[in-house]
Every structure is written in structure tokens, then in C-alpha cells.
Amino acid sequence: MSSEMPLPTTIVAPTCSMGEKNVLKRYRRQVSSTRNFKRHVNTNVLRKRRLAAGVRCHDRFYKRLYAEAMCLGSQVYDWPGRSFAKIFGKVMVLDVFKQLTDFRLVFEVNLERRRPDCICMFKLPRDLWEVGCDGVCVILELKTCKFSRNLKTRSKHEQRLTGIKQLLDSKSLIGQIAPQGSDCIVICPMLVFVARRKLSVLHVMCLKKRHIVTDFHRLCSILATASDYKARITDTHKILKRHNTNTIHIQRRSGKASANVTDLRNHIACNKTATLSFSNNQERTGGTAMRNMANIIARLVQRP
């Protein structure tokens, strides 16, 4: 056996003709273009989904803020809700809200160039909050966040810059459309970050205030006229489908016929008969369901 080592063999790359090379180039070009197209489509779909999720979150937060504001104006509740307190507590002490003489809340006000999410108008006794101040105009710009743990991400930084620019423009536009008057109003722009899932207020950022002299009630009328959104608490219930409107449980759960069920029970307990007067809309939409429900309750009451 010889001690000489065999020489290493060189591996020659396989050769292919020009036609095969062109076929490979064409295939790679098609694959890369398909991948880019899919990536572009996925980006557009994600952008649309994020936009739709933000719109839904805005709508839900509008209803919550509206409900808490209505509780503030009622005589039953002496303290505002959590979101209301966390936002407007940055502007003034919450005890001041108990002495409000007027309160207006409008959503999505169309100011031509800008469209602030929410504008709150507070009418106060003079010198209660600040010297010479008759009212406060709070401009809210909402930014929804899917992930609420870290507020220093690049996307939230972009949201912060965009929101600040929107608030500054809205502040100047309100100063331009404000009519002449004798009320000293303080404009307070505020940027609010809201969790998309739980609707909790994550962070509130207050910008520089501005004092204007205008008429409070006329300014409220102008802003209410320019609003493109009307808060309706009655829209919080889901619309019942035709195939499941015949059960009392679903009627109760939706809250659509709770008052009618209570009145019906009281009437049956007294007269042992089931009679209900429906409006035209109830006859057209829920007449059959209500008649079936009346028959069921009448049978339950007649049992020994």
C-alpha cells in the first residue's frame, strides 16, 4: 500500500445552455413578482383591517364617553365614570364638574381641513376655575392602540406626531369660526391613547391652551351643526334576527322587550288576560314574537 495521498478531484459546475438560463431567469422573475404582489396585497388588507378596527374602537369609546357624561348630568350619580375622570381630570378638578351650568358633547366635528374626534364644552361660573374664565372647550383626539404595554414604539410615536398636528390645526380653526361675544373660553387640546380591546385610557397628553372671547351658546350651536356623528345609546343593542325572535330569553337578553314583559306580567296578575297595544313599528317587526310571548306568560300564570 503506497503512502502517497490521492490528489483532490476538482468539482466542475454543471453547464447549461443559454435557453435553460433564460428559463431560470424567467422563472425567478415570475416568483419574485408574485411574492411582491402577495406582500403588497397583504399590506393593503392589514391596513384596511387596522382602519376598520380603529373605527369600531372610536364608536365604542364615543358611546362610553356619552354614557358617562349623561351620568354626570343626572342627579343619581355624583361622580363621573373612570374614562371621563381620567381624561378631564387633567384639565380641572373633578369637584368643579358638580357646579357646571351647561355641558355639550359633540363627536366628529367637520372643520373642513380637520375633523376632531370629540369636542366638549363646559359652561362655568365666572372665576370658578380661572380668573375671568366663563367656559372651557376641550378638543379630544383619540389614538387607538392594539398593544398597550409599551407606549414608546415607532407606530405610537407617529400617532403622537400626527395627533399633535391635528390638534394644533383644530385649535386654530375653532378660533377662526368662533363668533363674537363676551364669554372668555379656554381651548384645551388633548391627545388621548385608548386601548382597542378594553377601551381603557392609557395616556393623556395636554397641549398649550388658548384663550378666546366668543359667545358660548352660539359656538356650541356651530359645533353641533358641523358634527357628522350623533351618539345614540339605543344603538348599543344588537338587531334581532327573524329566526330567533320567538323566545323570551333572547328578548330579555337584548333588552328590547324588558319593559313590555314587566308590564305584561303586572297586567296578567291583575286581570288574568293578556292584552298589549303595539305601535306601527312593533306590529310590523315584532308583533308575532310579542303575541307568542304573551301566550307563554299567560299559560305560566294560569298554572296552579
Swiss-Prot record:
<keyword id="KW-1035">Host cytoplasm</keyword>
<comment type="function">
    <text>May play a role in the dispersal of host nucleolin from the nucleolus throughout the nucleus leading to a decrease in ribosome biogenesis.</text>
</comment>
<dbReference type="InterPro" id="IPR002580">
    <property type="entry name" value="Herpes_UL24"/>
</dbReference>
<keyword id="KW-1048">Host nucleus</keyword>
<dbReference type="GO" id="GO:0039592">
    <property type="term" value="P:symbiont-mediated arrest of host cell cycle during G2/M transition"/>
</dbReference>
<protein>
    <recommendedName>
        <fullName>Protein UL24 homolog</fullName>
    </recommendedName>
</protein>
<dbReference type="GO" id="GO:0042025">
    <property type="term" value="C:host cell nucleus"/>
</dbReference>
<dbReference type="Pfam" id="PF01646">
    <property type="entry name" value="Herpes_UL24"/>
</dbReference>
<keyword id="KW-1040">Host Golgi apparatus</keyword>
<dbReference type="GO" id="GO:0044177">
    <property type="term" value="C:host cell Golgi apparatus"/>
</dbReference>
<keyword id="KW-1079">Host G2/M cell cycle arrest by virus</keyword>
<keyword id="KW-1121">Modulation of host cell cycle by virus</keyword>
<keyword id="KW-0945">Host-virus interaction</keyword>
<comment type="similarity">
    <text>Belongs to the HHV-1 UL24 protein family.</text>
</comment>
